[in-house]
């Protein structure tokens, strides 16, 4: 898949180069498939009115630390420029009207596709999380509570669940900060075990955009920052989505 992404990127870059200089997107506001403004871009990803279920809302399984920190970040959305990202069951729902670049799109007759981190439907048993994004600073904070279905060592979360959650937070941040679409690499250094049903805070930042790649970093820690669970870095391929053809 990664090789295929590079092949498509190279082909798109070649055709674009015949018409204009290659365009790297170092800021959030250039013209793109989303339109000519940041507002247009976010209106696609963050619809004001939708009948889709937002899974990034509090439920009875959330621990007290998760609930209180969620409320703190909600307050920041009112005054500090933070945005609470909705979380639908499929990424298809986040990019309605758009599609993957030519050569990457696949057809499927599956009607109930789900993103991996929303595949466990029982509240509190799988991935409980919410992501807040700061567009000016190009960073995110993810509040993650691993449930008992994500257990690895008895009583502790499987390392793969944290890796999946880091990748998901990286991908949403990369997409909104610079049209990052695909994970090219993900490196994780685990530091401490995470108790099941406890809060993990993940601080994600975009470090740079270079050669059509977005370089990201993440620190996963406890709320009081006294325990670091893991540190990671990721690289994402920058590609623009395309408008879907009218049916």
Curated annotation (Swiss-Prot):
Task of the protein: Has acyl-CoA thioesterase activity towards long-chain (C16 and C18) fatty acyl-CoA substrates, with a preference for linoleoyl-CoA and other unsaturated long-chain fatty acid-CoA esters. Plays an important role in mitochondrial fatty acid metabolism, and in remodeling of the mitochondrial lipid cardiolipin. Required for normal mitochondrial function.
Record's keyword terms, sorted: Fatty acid metabolism, Hydrolase, Lipid metabolism, Mitochondrion
Name the UniProt record assigns to this protein: Acyl-coenzyme A thioesterase THEM5
Source superkingdom: Eukaryota
Organism, as annotated: Homo sapiens (Human)
Location, primary (coarse class): mitochondrion
Annotated family: Belongs to the THEM4/THEM5 thioesterase family.
Subcellular location: Mitochondrion matrix
Known catalytic reactions: hexadecanoyl-CoA + H2O = hexadecanoate + CoA + H(+); (9Z,12Z)-octadecadienoyl-CoA + H2O = (9Z,12Z)-octadecadienoate + CoA + H(+); tetradecanoyl-CoA + H2O = tetradecanoate + CoA + H(+); (9Z)-octadecenoyl-CoA + H2O = (9Z)-octadecenoate + CoA + H(+)
Enzyme type, top EC level: hydrolase
Keyword presence, Mitochondrion: yes
Oligomer status and interactors: Homodimer.
GO cellular component, one term: mitochondrial matrix
GO molecular function: long-chain fatty acyl-CoA hydrolase activity
Pfam families the UniProt entry points to: 4HBT (PF03061)
GO BP terms, alphabetized: cardiolipin acyl-chain remodeling; fatty acid metabolic process; long-chain fatty-acyl-CoA metabolic process
Enzyme Commission number(s) of this protein: 3.1.2.2
Active site (UniProt): 167 (proton donor/acceptor)
């Amino acid at each position: 898949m990664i090789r295929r992404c590079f092949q498509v990127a190279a082909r798109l870059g070649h055709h674009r180069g015949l018409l204009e200089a290659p365009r790297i997107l170092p800021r959030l506001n250039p013209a793109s498939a989303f339109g000519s403004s940041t507002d247009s871009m976010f209106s696609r990803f963050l619809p004001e009115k939708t009948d889709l279920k937002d899974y990034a809302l509090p439920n009875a399984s959330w621990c007290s630390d998760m609930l209180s920190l969620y409320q703190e970040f909600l307050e920041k959305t009112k005054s500090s420029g933070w945005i609470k990202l909705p979380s639908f069951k499929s990424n298809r729902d986040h990019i309605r009207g758009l599609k993957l670049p030519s050569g990457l799109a696949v057809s499927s007759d599956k009607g109930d596709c789900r993103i991996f981190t929303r595949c466990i439907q029982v509240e509190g048993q799988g991935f409980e999380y919410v992501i807040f994004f700061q567009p000016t600073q190009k960073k995110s904070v993810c509040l993650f509570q691993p449930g008992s279905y994500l257990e690895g060592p008895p009583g502790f979360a499987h390392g793969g669940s944290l890796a999946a959650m880091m990748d998901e937070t990286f991908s949403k941040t990369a997409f909104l900060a610079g049209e990052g679409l695909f994970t090219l690499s993900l490196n994780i250094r685990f530091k401490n075990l995470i108790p099941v049903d406890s809060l993990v805070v993940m601080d994600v930042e975009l470090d740079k955009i270079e050669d059509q790649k977005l370089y990201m970093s993440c620190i996963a820690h406890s709320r009081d920052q006294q325990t670091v669970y893991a540190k990671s870095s990721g690289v994402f391929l920058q590609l623009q989505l395309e408008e879907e053809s009218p049916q």
